[in-house]
Amino acid sequence: MNTIAQKYFVLAGIIIFSCFVCICQSSEKESAKDDYYVAALIWPSCHDDPAGREHVWSDGTGEWEVIKKGNPRYEGHYQPKEPLWGYEMDNDPKVVEKWIAAATDHGVNVFIYDWYWYNEGPFLESALNDGFLKAENNETMGFYLMWANHDMPLDLINVHRYQDGNSIVWDAAVDWENYTTIVERVIRQYFQKPNYFKIDGQPVFGVFDLNNLLQSFGGSVEETRKGLDYFREEAKKAGFAGVHFQYLPGGGSSLEAAKREAALVEALGFGSVTMYNMGGLSEDYIAYGNNSIKIREQWDEVLNIPFFPCISVGWDNTPRFPQLGMKNTVHYNNSPESFAALLSKAKQYVDNRPDQPKLMVINAWNEWVEGSYLLPDMKYGFGYLEAVKDVMDGKYDRYK
């Protein structure tokens, strides 16, 4: 081989190797402080789940059964919600491939899956296992789990089947045997995926309800810490730096409540706090957003760990509860433009904290039954996704 040919051969090898490294790195969803992470929550209820069919939704379409029965409670009330793409199953990989393409095209690059496990076993796992993880393009999207460890009341999930709001299908607290099953299953099935989202080498694992977490360990903070330390050690055995536990409460309340919860998450060794809903509900979306910023400021005052902002698209859970009406929904100024303005403030918030990952959480990707979703519908089309893209492209920076 002559000298010129050798040089080209070596150069080609370097290029191929560089491309290989880039491809490998692109599938690893490790947070970097210079990158933005826009994470949308997924409520995986719209498919035929065995436990769901037996106890909750009987027609084989999951919660679409309830969503389709939404009815207007006041003039101009947009019910039932109508998906632009129709009533698709969230455990269909072809559907999720479309989701991932739409999300990544518009600046959403992480999905947070609500994940359920009761003493009776798993619930709604198929959306993640068969939908997301079998989507051909899934590794272009980061993901992590939020353990949705809340009780499952009868009327919350299907008021048309149950009118009894005092009984529950499953209790959220789990015993030690089930807890160790959770730990093993989560590490083996999910943490090992190259696109599982990590902070400082630690897979992120969200927890929705602190009180129910404590109840799984007899109500003891000390025993709960031991349980979480067990999870951490098992993750280290699997080759990870530990587990980044993240608290995602359903909404905000008082400063005193924030102080109590901040002390608890730090005693348990949590790594961060965000929210499932942004809190501060109001009929006016602008007031709702301003209230949520005050709640964010409360958390900032009491936390010694990172807080990541949450932005809700809206709120309307009237399909679940016949007694609710106008005062229980967000219906003034609830538009993609208002949402974009609020998201731009969240972006500014993370920009002002250069020492922590630039993570923003959006409620939600598909909370149709709660009126909070980015997915395109028959009213706004792709309006909310376009709003995310505009903000992440800097088009709203001039309004700061």
Model-derived regions: residue spans:
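Bacterial N-terminal signal peptides
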Residues: 10-20
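Bacterial N-terminal signal peptides that target proteins for export
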Residues: 2-10
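Bacterial Sec-dependent signal peptides at the C-terminal "C-region" and cleavage site
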Residues: 19-32
